[in-house]
């Protein structure tokens, strides 16, 4: 399988007024991310290269990583710690950061971008938050921004990390401004607790795009709706959610979040596998997991769409549920987007409800998110639709593509 990412030209950035990323030639860039948070210290260079080669071949375009080990006393696989004195952010160990660059440079050769969390601020799983104060952390911020400013495949800085970190907001703001001053073209966001970081920093000049974070389908929908109502001219994507390999998490759950993000955010999505982000002994076997293949299918489908022109529908304007009081049916909103200029509609439907398009349909098709295979529309009545049964894994989720005769704007 060939590397699917070479068509993009670095650097990748957000142009003014765009709700998506684009490359140096202004080509829309689909953020298809993978969380390998511990890549820089749990993986050897050779293992990291194997991982990156696989993700590039599968069509992933962004790797989300943490720059520092989980705890200040940890080292990377070559025995190097990021700081020569534990907990002293002034005592940077250049060898550690040089080895990070080797991974970043290898990813660049493969056409991969990196979204990097410079210092993870979770107070319940890491201890770096204890040192996030004063001039020391601002000097560290300047060091990191300058150390990697020559790399044009860093797509974003992820500030925060699994925590609202309310007591640290003043320092977070100062730190983020330093990154923006030194790296003005690298986008920035905030990774909060189970919510959206825009609630705290969305109005700041350094905040460029939203990173939703949710483990609940209804909440995920509401996060996208909230962000788009506040910041209609900024991108948003689901940056973290359920992980493949976690107990009770089936692939249809992962697909629901993926397509919700792609459809409602108009920007991209980030997938993750438990054994890969943690770096367990099973990480290599997990590279070819079922859901990672489904993400590859999603990319192939989206590459055929003029997706950057799609607009999400949060009000149920384009698809109307007709009947849901029946087994395995729902009346909840259908993730839907529409390209008004091309009269195209895309939706993700995962139950047996009856529904209709509010606009006259010229033609359409169902797309199996497992295989990418297509099926003809199955009309129950003159204008009534229902999913065509079970997909290739025996689940009930499908993509609907419609070409409309006209769109009543």
PLM regions with names:
Residues 2-221:
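Active-site mouth of glycoside hydrolases
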Residues 17, 59, 150, 184, ...:
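Residue-level preference for short coil/turn positions at secondary-structure junctions
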Residues 35-36, 373, 381:
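A generic structural motif
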Residues 64, 80-81, 237-238, 270, ...:
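Structured core elements
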Residues 114, 236, 364:
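Hydrophobic anchor at the start of a short beta-strand
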Residues 146, 160-293:
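Extracellular glycoside hydrolase catalytic/binding regions
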Residues 244-245, 254-378, 387-409:
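Aromatic- and carboxylate-lined catalytic core of secreted/periplasmic carbohydrate-active enzymes
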Residues 383-385:
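Short strand-edge motifs at loop-to-beta-strand transitions and within beta-strands
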